[in-house]
Amino acid sequence: YTLYNRHLIYEDQKYTAITICKSPALTAEDDPGFQIYNIDNTSSNDFADAYNGTGKAGKIAQIVEEYAKSHLPVLILGENGTGKGKAASLIYKQSNYKHAPFYSIDCSLIKERKWHSLLNNENSPLNEVDSTVFFEKADALSLEQIGDLFQYIDQTKLCTRMRLIVSLSTNNSNQPAFATIRTFMENHLSCLTLNLPPLRERIDDFSGITALYLHRFNVSLGKQIIGFDVEAMEKMLSYNWPNNLDQLQHVLKELVTITKTPYISCDTVEAIL
């Protein structure tokens, strides 16, 4: 809804006429490229648990907490599946912007018409104040779309009105879009940069992460899996995990589902990986 008012004078009396106009929402509720959240329905607990440890994990958790206190834009870098979206949600939940909406725009799913509306429609959420907007997978945008976004950010002073968070996949670090966005964010907007390490570089945290996920799947699936055989854990540790935490959760869910013994065997792990 949009409110308009104008002042009228009739028979020496002053009146204020208020018009309420109903216009179509910019986005549909089932649009996968655009989602609206608030502090109660953002999904950040998995990230907080998976990065709440020692070494690199503990430092990441501390950095997120400090970044949340700032008003500066944030650039989140990491491979596919490292939890960039959940990191953005956690920054939002711990920030002073948490009582306003959190707008998540998946740039890999957004259509050209929708993108044009976001940057030009008067009802666009990008015109709001004190909200948080998260451009996920921004490296999926075309160079033309990126240029339009940069122009919009500058002309509307978006970073003075809202909290801007952008994520890039380092799997695409050799693409022009990645370098263009990173340069703009770091050099032009003086953003804060959060680097999420891949799972293969977090060997010290691996057993703790798997124990956490095993417990969750035991509860949700009604199982009582204690852990892994020695050889099975060695197999898990030696695997490269190209899709990182997302892949680990998927694999563990399958392992818990098909395992009938207290410990997951090496043969079972080999069958799934």
Task: Enumerate the predicted regions with their spans.
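A short, hydrophobic, proline-anchored segment that marks a local hinge/packing element in signaling
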Residues: T2-E11, P198
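Beta-strand residues that line the small-molecule/cofactor-binding core
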Residues: Y1-T2, Y15, F102
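AAA+ ATPase active-site-proximal loops
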Residues: N38-P176, L199, N218, G222-T261
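ABC-type ATPase nucleotide-binding domain
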Residues: H188, L192, L255-T259, I272
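Sensory coupling linkers of modular signal transduction proteins
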Residues: L8-A57
